[in-house]
Amino acid sequence: MMPVLTLITRLGVGVLCLGLFGACASYSIGGSNPHVAQAITHAQEAGDHGGMGHADALVTHAEVALQHAQAAKKDMQNPHLDAGIAELGEAITHGKAGHTDVATDHAKAALMHLQEIK
């Protein structure tokens, strides 16, 4: 009876460990910082609106993305976050100047950098 109980205990511990590992892995893959997730969402919106020629909407979403990216920077250091912040700043500057195509390129570059944050 004892070997069966030991086997069941070991299986239970193994399943528990796998479950914890899976939870941790999905947490890091999904992005551990909610501000990064919001920055990605708004950078995507900025790029989408820029592609439609909507400079004002691009600027609005890029500004929100920038606020979230700067908030994330308080919690983490990442070169992609720094690059994303710089690109969002450029997107805002060019969008306000009416350079929608250039602003869109910067918003898309920001999005690519933000998506690289693990």
Segments the model singles out, each with a brief description of its role:
Residues R10-A23:
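Bacterial N-terminal signal peptides
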Residues M2-L11:
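Bacterial Sec-dependent N-terminal signal peptides
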Residues L5-T6, G22-K118:
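Long, charged/polar, soluble alpha-helical segments
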